[in-house]
C-alpha cells in the first residue's frame, strides 16, 4: 500500500514539473523565425520572409526502367535513349521523354513511354502510353498479366 502511495506522489510531482515546463516554453515564442504567422488564432498563414523553393525540373536524354516477367520471375534493367525502342519479351518499350525533379526532398523521375504488345497473327496492341513516376509505382496504369514495368531513373 505504501508503494502505491509513493508512486502516486511521484506521478503528481512529475506531472506538475511537466506542466510548469510547458508553460515556460510557451512564453519564449519567437514569431520572427516561425514558419507560420497566425493571422488570427484559428487561421495561420505562411511566413512570406521564408525562402520557399519551387520545384526545378531537367530534361535528360536517357532513362532507365526495370522490366519484370511475372511468369519466369526474371527482371532486367533496361537503359533507353529518348526516341529509342527496345523489346522485353513480346512487348516493345519506347521512351519519349525523361524528366528529373532536382528538388533534393522530392527526387522523382518522370518517364513518358509507349508500350506495345506484339502477338503472332495479330495487330500490335497499345498497352500503355503516358507518364510513369519512379517514386509512385501505383500512379502508372500499366497493367499486364505477364509483364510489369517500373520507372527507375533519368540520366
Swiss-Prot record:
InterPro entries: DUF2155
Name assigned to this protein: Uncharacterized protein RP359
Amino acid at each position: 500500500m505504501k508503494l502505491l502511495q509513493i508512486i502516486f506522489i511521484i506521478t503528481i510531482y512529475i506531472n506538475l514539473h511537466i506542466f510548469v515546463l510547458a508553460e515556460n516554453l510557451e512564453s519564449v515564442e519567437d514569431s520572427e523565425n516561425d514558419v507560420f504567422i497566425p493571422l488570427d488564432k484559428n487561421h495561420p498563414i505562411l511566413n512570406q520572409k521564408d525562402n520557399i523553393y519551387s520545384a526545378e525540373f531537367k530534361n535528360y536524354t536517357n532513362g532507365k526502367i526495370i522490366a519484370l516477367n511475372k511468369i519466369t520471375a526474371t527482371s532486367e534493367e533496361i537503359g533507353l535513349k529518348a526516341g529509342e525502342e527496345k523489346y522485353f519479351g513480346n512487348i516493345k518499350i519506347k521512351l519519349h521523354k525523361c524528366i528529373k525533379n532536382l528538388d533534393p526532398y522530392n527526387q522523382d523521375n518522370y518517364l513518358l513511354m509507349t508500350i506495345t504488345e506484339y502477338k503472332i497473327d495479330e495487330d500490335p496492341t497499345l498497352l500503355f502510353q503516358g507518364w510513369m513516376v519512379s517514386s509512385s509505382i501505383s500512379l502508372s496504369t500499366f497493367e499486364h498479366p505477364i509483364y510489369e514495368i517500373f520507372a527507375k531513373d533519368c540520366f
